Amino acid sequence: MKHEHNKPLHRYGMVIDLDKCTGCGTCVVACASENNVSVRPDESDKKRFISWMQLYMITNGKEYPYTEVCYIPRPCMHCEEDGHGNPHPPCVSVCVATATRVDINTGIVSQIPTRCIGCRYCQAACPYHARYFNWWDAYFPKGKGLERYLSPEVSVRMRGVVEKCTFCHHRYMRAKRKAEAEGRRELKEEEYITACTEACPAGAITFGDLNNPKHKVSQLIKSDRAFRLLERLNTKPKVYYLSSKEWVRRMADNYLPEELKPVKPLALRR
Amino acid sequence: MTLLSIPKEKAKDWIEGICFFILGFIGALIVGWFLFPMALYSEHTQPIDFNHAIHLENVEGDTLTEKCLYCHEFYEDGTFAGIPRIEKCEDCHDPESPMGDSLEEKKFLTKYQAQEKEIPWYHYYRQPPCVYFPHISHVKMAKIACKTCHGDHGTSELLPVYQENRISGYSRNIWGKHISGYKEHTWDRMKMDDCAECHTKKGHEEFNSCFTCHK
């Protein structure tokens, strides 16, 4: 099924430098507090918990002293295609309630909790496990004051709906509102960045418009080190990763030996 | 079998039946469209009977919209003040020297300003928490007058009675004045389809994207 689809004006995307990422988890915390992500009494239940930004750890499997570790922060990939050449992500084409769409203005894959009927089809369709289901109503421990920290800019989800990373879309609206107060229609590069980008102490995350060649992200994705997760599925994610380690890039998408383009060592590149 | 071919003695029963059906139908409509809404909405009067017309005469501004913006202002970051806090009222109203001899002003000065208490207004146009509506995009960028959506509210002398849906807790101005779905003015109903209808009419179909109004 092919939808009528115009190219979005902006294509907001993210570049995460895995060589810089220390796996501290600040992005995960920043994301959860920014987006009113509910907590469970038992957060160690990893089958039921919700984390829009998930941190994965991979190792090269070698023994000491050759062990290497890499952390992969994983937001929603905001894919552009479903893998069969259709111009919508896998989750959008399966949604029966039109609760998730590609936003025509930003290229961001939207998720409307009040529209979602909770069939979880999108969760099954997403190759990145970026979607989470609310098994219970949003819960914030009583007496801890957590409910006072809720952001009015993001709606709190009810039970029975799916939620996911929205690239902090409310921050886009906030930036747009401010620009309009100043009489501008276009946003500057630094005006709209996600909470994880802002929080990352290592500066590993870069955020910007992939359609704008002046933005840093559109220059970074041309790097030799750039790759995307499960690239062979052809979902064209708008989240790129940078790594100079071959084993990391190989693990991100089980490449065949001749498929993986080698990265020149840092010393040679300069 | 048509009505004409029915024997005379049975025709009377038929006519009675049809009359009862019509009466019952009209009765059901009266219950559904008039009595049910009366039971569905609870009515509240505002804490202060605010006179917009008097205020409009006394505030600065060249156009009607500019006059509205004197109190219902935009902040620097583009957010909309909505119903102003009493700080804004204090710009003009002084407890030492009241501006007039109206009882409502006295009520404001003694009951709220003296005790530094915010006035618990009922919000006619408060949207559900999942809805994002930037006033600045509509008023400043699209140059839509306040009157276009809010009607004569700004020039009225009396505040209308606030009606709250007992089930959902939302204002009747959002939910729709007429339960039959009939809409005369913009301010009769402000639901999702009304946003989309206006966006489409003005040639801004790109703003019918879900994330434009949802959060």
For the regions a protein language model found, what residue spans apply to each?
Chain A
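Non-ligating segments of multi-cofactor redox enzymes
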Residues: 1-270
